Amino acid sequence: MAADSSCFVGDTHVLTMRKVWRVGGGLVGCAGDVAEIFAFVRWLKDGADKDDYPEMKNIEAIVVDPFGTARAYEGETSEPMVIRNEYCAIGSGRDVALGAMFAGADARMAVRAAVRHTGQSKPPVRVYRLKEKT
């Protein structure tokens, strides 16, 4: 999983932040409202009880479990969608990243393409891998 590091308020780049977390042996990548992202990650760390799903409207997330199964969360629903595609992307750079991966780029290069060709994706690009089972 790879991500850029931009955080915008409206059209203004206000800070650099991490967008991927390790939770329960898996990876969680998020895009959208910063407060909602932190609430979503906290919800996952606390056990992801569907009855306690935070009120959110402006968030996209990809959650990859320790076995490599990817699920997508979108806004108001606590029901994830299983991702069966070979690759996926979220956030402001999604269109460029998807095109780059279709053309053969790995996740790092896809995010680098988004940084180069979109206005709201910014470096540094960070790459995360699932930890090896021992």
Regions found by a protein language model. Name each.
Residues 1-134:
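N-terminal nucleophile
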